[in-house]
Swiss-Prot record:
Descriptive protein name: Protoheme IX farnesyltransferase
GO molecular function: protoheme IX farnesyltransferase activity
Entry EC no(s): 2.5.1.141
Chief location bin: membrane
Note: Carbon 2 of the heme B porphyrin ring is defined according to the Fischer nomenclature.
Xref: PANTHER family: PROTOHEME IX FARNESYLTRANSFERASE, MITOCHONDRIAL
UniProt KW Cell inner membrane keyword: yes
């Protein structure tokens, strides 16, 4: 079924349509942005008024949601070929492509000035960099090169840095360490996704790591990047973003995740990759809990 055919379906209810508009923003990804940007605000030195902090986080989430909507618009034909994504609002014909495009363009027009006013111009500039990198570089690059993994990790790691700069007004070692942590975490996380969704990505014509380099090589890179995550997560201690209790928890969690990654190097099939993907989510959740509880 083509997208044009799907668009001819009956108009959904107002509630369903509102839900579909929200789905364009990819709520799970936007939710992670809310948590990490709020985390950057909370961990940064100094005090930020609650109203200002809330507006900063909401404006950040709005920019990221708009980037996701533009990604959905650009990849609607690809999504229609993939089982995991073919029921998304655009390939299923429940939302008109021009609506998604309009939201993706107009929301940042309002959200970026809000960030500049309630936070500072530096934070708004970081949001703009994340938007452009995700939409104009990462999204088209997914069909051409496995380097899209590294490029896509940049906008994914910027939200906690935005939270930090919103509180401090500057780029410094503490904020960059938070950026490095989220950047490093995404590598084994999405490499695992490329294994257990390999067939679906192949249907979509996306050049993910497991398709180009093979599953065994991908598993080896999962182990290597999971191991690299351990020292990166510990950088927050000498930089005095977090205390020794966080360091102890981060070391245990990191070694456990890396051990699980190395145990999967010689395995076959997608089950382990799916379990490792879930393990990375648990790891990040527990790490942020420890980070908040062990902050200096």
């Amino acid at each position: 079924m083509t997208i044009a055919t799907a668009s001819a379906r009956a108009r959904p209810s107002s509630l369903q349509y509102a839900k579909d508009l929200l789905l364009l923003a990819k709520p799970r990804l936007s939710g992670l942005v809310i948590v990490t940007s709020a985390g950057g605000l909370a961990l940064a030195p100094g005090h930020v008024a609650p109203a200002r902090a809330a507006l900063t986080v909401l404006a950040t989430a709005a920019v990221v949601g708009a980037a996701n909507a533009l990604n959905c618009w650009m990849e609607r034909e690809i999504d229609a070929r993939m089982r995991r994504t073919r029921d998304r609002p655009l390939p299923a014909g429940r939302v008109d492509p021009f609506t998604a495009l309009g939201l993706g363009i107009m929301v940042p027009v309002f959200a970026l000035p809000v960030l500049a006013l309630v936070a500072n111009p530096l934070t708004a500039a970081l949001a703009f960099v994340a938007l452009v990198t995700y939409v104009a570089v990462y999204t088209p690059m997914k069909q051409r090169s496995t380097l899209a993994l590294l490029v896509g990790a940049v906008p994914g790691a910027i939200p906690p840095l935005m939270g930090w700069t919103a509180a401090t007004g500057r780029l410094d070692a503490g904020g960059l360490a938070l950026f490095a942590l989220l950047f490093a975490w995404q590598l084994p996380h999405f490499l695992a996704v490329s294994i257990y969704l390999r067939d679906d990505y192949a249907r979509g014509g996306l050049r993910v790591f497991s398709i180009v380099h093979g599953e065994r090589t991908t598993r080896a890179w999962i182990a290597a990047t999971a191991a690299a995550l351990v020292p990166v997560s510990l950088l927050l201690v000498p930089l005095r973003v977090a205390g020794p209790s966080y360091g102890a928890v981060a070391a245990v969690l990191g070694v456990a995740l890396a051990g699980y990654a190395f145990a999967g190097v010689g395995r076959e099939g997608g089950r382990w990759a799916r379990n490792f993907f879930l393990a990375t989510i648990l790891y990040l959740t527990l790490l942020f809990v420890a980070l908040f509880l062990g902050a200096r």
